[in-house]
């Protein structure tokens, strides 16, 4: 879903329970994605540059901390200034240093990150500190015109 948002794509995810994704879907709609929910699928379409927003991770049914890096990538490409507040885990922002190597403009203070959206990323060699960060950096790589290598 976030790959579609980052690349201005059109993706349908099958075999999901859309109700379980309410917080994630709500944020995708908030930033400007078109989202269609089906019985066991979700379609995400992003045609234009997306908008900034505020995200705060919370226990289910709130916004999932596991999806925080993925929306961070999308917000780094969105128009305007976004804020992510991580209220579940410490040190969940390690991927942002790597995203900055690709051209993202980010300031981290404690458990909050302020992200100023840029038009596009530049390809770079980046290192994923964990699985979630690796997924996010792969999405960032899809959104570049250059070559991105994720170690």
Regions found by a protein language model. Give the residues of each.
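Short, structured segments at the rim of ligand-binding sites
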Residues: 1-151
């Amino acid at each position: 879903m976030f790959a579609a948002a980052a690349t201005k794509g059109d993706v349908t995810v099958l075999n999901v329970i859309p109700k379980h994704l309410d917080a994630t879907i709500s944020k995708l709609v908030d930033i400007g994605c078109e989202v269609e929910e089906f019985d066991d699928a979700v379609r995400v379409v992003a045609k234009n540059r997306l908008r900034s927003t505020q995200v705060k991770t919370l226990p289910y049914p709130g916004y999932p901390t596991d999806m925080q890096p993925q929306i961070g990538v999308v917000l780094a490409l969105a128009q305007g200034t976004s804020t992510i507040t991580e209220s579940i885990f410490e040190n969940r922002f390690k991927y942002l240093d790597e995203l900055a190597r690709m051209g993202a403009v980010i300031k981290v203070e404690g458990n909050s990150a302020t992200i100023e959206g840029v038009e596009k990323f530049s390809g770079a060699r980046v290192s994923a500190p964990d699985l979630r960060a690796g997924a996010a950096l792969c999405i960032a790589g899809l959104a570049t015109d250059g070559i991105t290598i994720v170690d």
